[in-house]
């Protein structure tokens, strides 16, 4: 019998062509550089920001000098025949990347494409990892730092894409939405998250809310682009309205291609009248129905979303490096801390 429990299918069944395109200050450590090439990724996507924060841009001669220094810093360490990686971690420091393209995705979300220092460079990110953005508001004493998960292909050369939702009062997301092509942003990485390898678990479940789909999509894409990876995936994705569902065409395409291994369940707080999916919030009854049972061996539940959702489902993290106590619905359903990972 299939591991996937029958439930209301998503309304997003029509496949669309996949495009190759498109607080307080916290301390984040980047991962040291590793050898080898990045994995080949076939499906394109946009990238969703994890949270909002403030902004500052560089212009004029200072920007040019900063960009030249970034290129020199990265390229002088490259050996012949090695794939160039923009983000190598360790003591690399910040790269000043130029905004190349801006695309309006919906009423509060934009896709931003930043150029890497060289056209034949890949980002250097792996699954699952993120980047850290920085800006210093005018007259502010401290810079604002915020992590984002690019889900442009890890093998894409010359650019990274961020899909950024604008949050009211969020200085970084507000600044990023105000940026124009040609302006620059300080970025570094990679920020290591959950190290994925093919068939690490037999079945994973991804519980996401809003822009929390970002690291989930990074995992999904890596799994289904690898013919050797047979992992089964269940996605539960909550949003306010249908318009807020990001990456819906990409997700529907994967589900249509792999119906026995990938199932997506969408939950809308304010659904349209014709909505055939789940309504309200992600709740205990839904998760009990569609998630793999906690008694099953070799499963993992990933959670990412706004603080209120995290508190209800799993409890929030204490810090970027501290998963915190497992609470909420997942604990009530009998999952152990080892079976749950909070992005």
From Swiss-Prot:
Q: What highest taxon heads this organism's lineage?
A: Eukaryota
**TM region positions:** 41-61
Q: Which GO terms describe its cellular component?
A: mitochondrial outer membrane
User: Which reactions are catalysed by this chain?
Assistant: 2 Fe(III)-[cytochrome b5] + NADH = 2 Fe(II)-[cytochrome b5] + NAD(+) + H(+)
Q: What GO terms describe the biological role, i.e. biological process, of this protein? A: ergosterol biosynthetic process
Q: What is its main location?
A: mitochondrion
Name the keywords, alphabetized. Answer: FAD, Flavoprotein, Membrane, Mitochondrion, Mitochondrion outer membrane, NAD, Oxidoreductase, Transmembrane, Transmembrane helix
Start and end of every FAD-binding FR-type domain?
A: 92-197
Q: Which cell locations does it reside in?
A: Mitochondrion outer membrane
Swiss-Prot/TrEMBL cofactor(s):
FAD
Q: Which SUPFAM superfamilies match?
A: Ferredoxin reductase-like, C-terminal NADP-linked domain, Riboflavin synthase domain-like
Q: What does this protein do?
A: May mediate the reduction of outer membrane cytochrome b5.
By sequence similarity, the record places it as follows: Belongs to the flavoprotein pyridine nucleotide cytochrome reductase family.
Tell me what this protein is called: NADH-cytochrome b5 reductase 2
* Species in which this protein is naturally found: Neurospora crassa (strain ATCC 24698 / 74-OR23-1A / CBS 708.71 / DSM 1257 / FGSC 987)
Question: Lineage, please?
Answer: Eukaryota, Fungi, Dikarya, Ascomycota, Pezizomycotina
Gene symbol of the encoding locus = mcr-1
């Amino acid at each position: 019998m299939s591991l996937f429990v029958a439930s209301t299918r998503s309304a997003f069944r029509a496949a669309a062509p996949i495009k190759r395109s498109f607080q307080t200050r916290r301390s984040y450590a980047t991962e040291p550089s590793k050898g080898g090439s990045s994995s080949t990724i076939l499906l394109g996507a946009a990238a969703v920001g994890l949270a909002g924060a403030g902004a500052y841009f560089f212009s004029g001669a200072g920007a040019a000098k900063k960009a030249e220094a970034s290129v020199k810093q990265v390229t002088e360490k490259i050996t012949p025949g090695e794939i160039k990686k923009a983000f190598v971690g360790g003591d690399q420091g910040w790269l000043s990347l130029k905004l190349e393209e801006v695309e309006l995705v919906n009423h509060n979300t934009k896709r931003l494409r930043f150029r890497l220092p060289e056209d034949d460079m890949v980002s250097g990110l792996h699954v699952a990892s993120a980047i850290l953005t920085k800006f210093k508001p005018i007259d502010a004493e401290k810079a604002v730092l915020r992590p984002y998960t690019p889900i442009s292909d890890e093998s894409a050369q010359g650019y990274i894409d961020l899909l950024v939702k604008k949050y009211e009062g969020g200085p970084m997301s507000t600044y990023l939405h105000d940026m124009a092509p040609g302006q620059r942003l300080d970025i570094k990485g990679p920020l290591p998250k959950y190290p994925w390898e093919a068939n690490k678990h037999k079945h994973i479940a991804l519980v996401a809310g809003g822009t929390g789909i970002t690291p989930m999509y990074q995992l999904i894409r890596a799994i289904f682009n690898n013919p050797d990876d047979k992992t089964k995936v269940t996605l539960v994705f909550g949003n306010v309205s249908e318009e807020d569902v990001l990456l819906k065409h990409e997700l529907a395409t994967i589900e249509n291609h792999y119906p026995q291994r990938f199932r997506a369940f969408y939950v809308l707080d304010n659904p349209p009248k014709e909505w055939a999916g789940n309504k309200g919030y992600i709740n205990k009854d839904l998760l009990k129905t569609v998630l793999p049972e906690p008694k099953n061996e070799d499963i993992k539940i990933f959670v990412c979303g706004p603080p209120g959702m995290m508190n209800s489902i799993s409890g929030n993290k204490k810090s970027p490096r501290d998963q915190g106590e497992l609470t909420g619905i997942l604990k009530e359903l009998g999952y152990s801390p080892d079976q749950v990972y909070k992005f």
